[in-house]
Amino acid sequence: MYFLVADHREHHVIPFLKTDFHDMQHNPMFTQKQALLEIKQLFTGDYLICKSPTTILACIERKTYKDFAASLKDGRYKNRQKMLSLREQTNCQLYFFVEGPAFPNPQKKINHVAYASIITAMTHLMVRDHIFVIQTKNEAHSSQKLVQLFYAFSKEMVCVVPTSLTPTDEELCIKLWSSLSGISGVIGKILANTCSVAHLVSGKLSSQNIDQLKTPSNRPFPKKVKRMLISISKGNKELEIKLLSGVPNIGKKLAAEILKDHALLFFLNQPVECLANIQIVQKTRTIKLGMKRAEAIHYFLNWCGSAHVTDDSQNITEASRPATQPAATQPLHEVSDDATSNASDTSSPIGHQTLSKEMLLNTA
């Protein structure tokens, strides 16, 4: 049996991993009955792909551009020696995930380090140390890449890439929330599973409730994000346009045209047909918004992954779902309810503090 061990400090990726592992278990192509995700304290790398009983197949370190730049400055870049030592003992493969927007300007400064220097360091990891370097966009993308690696190592899949690449409703709603400046994939996921946009713009999410929102590491949301959410609940037109532009097939220009004369709440309180008949002025003609776009707007602005949203604020049925969209994802799979907060208390550590165990591991 194969399993993935995640370091308990990976708060930003673990929520995505729980969902992705849940989805993987329901993939008919995956023959293993259980796709195990274990959350423990690691001292080498951030993730280990393992095979029962004690074989380490791969060790993965995840760094954002800022982390990578900081490690170059303070010498923590040399911590790769721990990974190299683990490979020598177990014959496992080594991976570096570098997380951030693709291909910034080489002269761009990241934490006072030029991106060109980060590229050079990444090249050295591949050429000199024979460490695979994989670039990812954000936490959600890192989780997807981890699952793809798990697929490949498990050798239980006919193909490495999941059979369907169509984004789920949850992923589309996370992207919608992330269209607001300052909202990361992690915060977007929390919002997508806590309330709908309709819930927020109608004022049903109070300032007190917004103030109580927490990140996976139990920290309050950034003040900028909380101020922005409160501003949306009070009808900030500019932020409403940004949110609406996050709906599939609705860009900023079209969102601004839709909200030219009315607030977002006005359309959410109207039948879909009312929204479908909005006149959109183009260069050479005027067209209607249309039912497909109108249904998508109503569906995604009312979408919420939480089962605790009340009926009056989440009155969406499967019948109202746009036919062109994929089926909604199931609720977040609870691989380990208390894993993040109690990992160090309930799980034995893996790493150099228990190196005697690692040294007994079979070679991959």
Curated annotation (Swiss-Prot):
Cysteine pairs bridged by disulfides in the record: none
InterPro entries the record matches: ERCC4_domain, Mus81, Restrct_endonuc-II-like
UniProt record, GO biological process: DNA catabolic process; double-strand break repair via break-induced replication; symbiont-mediated suppression of host innate immune response; symbiont-mediated suppression of host type I interferon-mediated signaling pathway
Domain ERCC4: 3-102
Biased composition (Polar residues): 319-328
Function (record text): Plays a role in the inhibition of type I interferon signaling pathway. Mechanistically, specifically interacts with 2',3'-cGAMP and cleaves it via its phosphodiesterase activity. In turn, prevents 2',3'-cGAMP interaction with host ER-resident STING1 leading to inhibition of downstream signaling pathway and type I interferon production.
Protein name: ERCC4 domain-containing protein EP364R
Organism per entry: African swine fever virus (strain Badajoz 1971 Vero-adapted) (Ba71V)
Lineage: Viruses, Varidnaviria, Bamfordvirae, Nucleocytoviricota, Pokkesviricetes
